[in-house]
């Protein structure tokens, strides 16, 4: 047996009588016009539209319009909400203008006032001299004596000119000049000077003075003087002894002697070695001055390194002529004083031996000849032992021993002082006690 055939389902409205299909009912209107309507092949009637008519989302017929148009009260009108636009009573779109812009039948124009002109290239400014255009900018060229500043145009002032409180230009007046009530520059004069139209003149008594070849001189006449004044030819002078001298036009009491001074200079550089190095790292100041039968000394030490608690020594070793030797720990200059400078003994024509310590009072190469002094470092007392002639067998020496030196660099000592008896020389013999003048001068040196 073959496969069993299934029964095909039939629609409920199936009519077994031929024809089997239900005929479609077509109903046509009694008339169709071709104006505005369109009928498709299948008989569908529709509207025939063209832009700007369109169907919206609800399939309703509407009008499509672009920018510049809007619906107002179910009417299509021109949108005038943009700046500078409006509609006239005729409903036409026009521009809104404001002075100096004007609107005419020909178009928009600009009302021009004085100083402006219009050309094919555009609006321009009318200028006349001295105004001019430079770099598309209006400028005012300036003549000599004028200048442009942030505050505006002003006067360029040269030397000797200024402005007063009223901003007027005036002359700067220095010493010896003045402006009179008429604004004229004059030279004030006080007696015996006289200022006139011819210039400055000198008012003098013709009885006492005479003008000869533009030079004013004292009229010669007999003048009697009494000592100590003296008259020689046309000059009156003071007669004084060798105990006085004239210094800068003043009579002063002159000492009968001039002290010798050997020193390191007022501001020496590093000149002593304080540690085990080959380069000086300390500065020592020493000044020796012979006054009569004594040598007065002052000294000070400055260090650029830290020092530990130990004795620091600075020595000066001299030969038999008083010249500083190279084996001294002091390595700087040491010579005679000339104002604030140091000069060599040969240049000064002086003998440094005259300031050397006496070998009779301070024997050579012994340890017993010493002096005592002291200095302060940061308010700390430091004892200084000064040994004399202890380092030389045929010359002289001074050795400064600073005790318990433990200070942080940099530091400077105060000035210490001492004195000793110098050797006797034939260069400057000295006998007997100090005179009154010498004692006064010695006191002045001790006060310095």
UniProtKB/Swiss-Prot annotation:
Compartment annotation: Virion; Host nucleus
Primary subcellular site in the record, as a coarse category: virion
Note: All late proteins expressed from the major late promoter are produced by alternative splicing and alternative polyadenylation of the same gene giving rise to non-overlapping ORFs. A leader sequence is present in the N-terminus of all these mRNAs and is recognized by the viral shutoff protein to provide expression although conventional translation via ribosome scanning from the cap has been shut off in the host cell.
UniProt domain comment: The tail region anchors the fiber to penton base capsomers, whereas the shaft, built from several repeated motifs, allows the knob to protrude from the virion.
Cross-referenced SUPFAM superfamilies: Fibre shaft of virus attachment proteins, Virus attachment protein globular domain
Protein name from the UniProt record: Fiber protein
Pfam (any one): Adeno_shaft
GO cellular component: host cell nucleus; viral capsid
UniProt GO BP: adhesion receptor-mediated virion attachment to host cell; cell adhesion; symbiont entry into host cell
Keyword Transport carried by entry: no
Key words, A-Z: Capsid protein, Host nucleus, Host-virus interaction, Late protein, Viral attachment to host adhesion receptor, Viral attachment to host cell, Virion, Virus entry into host cell
Complex and partners: Homotrimer. Interacts (via N-terminal tail region) with pentons.
Role of this protein: Forms spikes that protrude from each vertex of the icosahedral capsid. Interacts with host receptor to provide virion initial attachment to target cell. Fiber proteins are shed during virus entry, when virus is still at the cell surface.
Entry's family note: Belongs to the adenoviridae fiber family.
Induction conditions: Expressed in the late phase of the viral replicative cycle.
């Amino acid at each position: 047996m073959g496969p069993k055939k299934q029964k095909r389902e039939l629609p409920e409205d199936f009519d077994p009588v031929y024809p089997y299909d239900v005929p479609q009912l077509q109903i046509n209107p009694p008339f169709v016009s071709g104006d505005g309507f369109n009928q498709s092949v299948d008989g569908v009637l529709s509207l025939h539209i063209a832009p700007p008519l369109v169907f919206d989302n609800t399939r309703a017929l509407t009008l499509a319009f672009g920018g510049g148009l809007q619906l107002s009260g179910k009417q299509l009108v021109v949108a005038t909400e943009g700046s500078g636009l409006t509609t006239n009573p005729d409903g036409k779109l026009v521009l809104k203008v404001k002075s100096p812009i004007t609107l005419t039948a020909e178009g928009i124009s600009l009302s021009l006032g004085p100083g402006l002109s219009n050309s094919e290239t555009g609006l321009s400014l009318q200028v006349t001299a001295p105004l001019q255009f430079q770099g598309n900018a209006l400028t005012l060229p300036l003549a000599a004596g004028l200048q442009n500043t942030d505050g505006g145009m002003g006067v360029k002032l040269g030397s000797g000119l200024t402005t007063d409180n009223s901003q007027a230009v005036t002359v700067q007046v220095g010493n010896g000049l003045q402006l009179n009530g008429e604004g004229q520059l004059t030279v004030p004069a006080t007696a015996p000077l006289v200022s006139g139209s011819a210039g400055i003149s000198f008012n003098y008594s013709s009885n006492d003075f005479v003008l000869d070849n533009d030079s004013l001189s004292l009229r010669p006449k007999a003048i009697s003087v009494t000592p100590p004044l003296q008259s020689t030819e046309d000059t009156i002078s003071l007669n004084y002894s060798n105990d006085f001298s004239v210094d800068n036009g003043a009579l002063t009491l002159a000492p009968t002697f001039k002290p010798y001074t050997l020193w390191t200079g007022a501001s020496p550089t590093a000149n002593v070695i304080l540690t085990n190095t080959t380069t000086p790292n300390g500065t020592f100041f020493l000044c020796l001055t012979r006054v009569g039968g004594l040598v007065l000394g002052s000294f000070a030490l400055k260090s650029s390194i830290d020092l530990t608690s130990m004795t620091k020594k600075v020595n000066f070793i001299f030969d038999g002529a008083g010249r500083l030797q190279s084996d001294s720990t002091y390595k700087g200059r040491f010579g005679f004083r000339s104002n604030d400078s140091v000069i060599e003994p040969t240049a000064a024509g002086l003998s440094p031996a005259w300031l050397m310590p006496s070998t009779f009072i301070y024997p050579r190469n012994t340890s017993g000849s010493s002096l005592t002094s002291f200095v302060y470092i940061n308010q700390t007392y430091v004892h200084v032992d000064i040994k004399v002639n202890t380092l030389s067998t045929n010359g002289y020496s001074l050795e400064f021993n600073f005790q318990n030196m433990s200070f942080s660099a940099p530091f400077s000592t105060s000035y210490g002082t001492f004195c000793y008896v110098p050797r006797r020389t034939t260069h400057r013999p000295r006998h007997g006690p100090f005179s009154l003048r010498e004692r006064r001068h010695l006191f002045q040196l001790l006060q310095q």
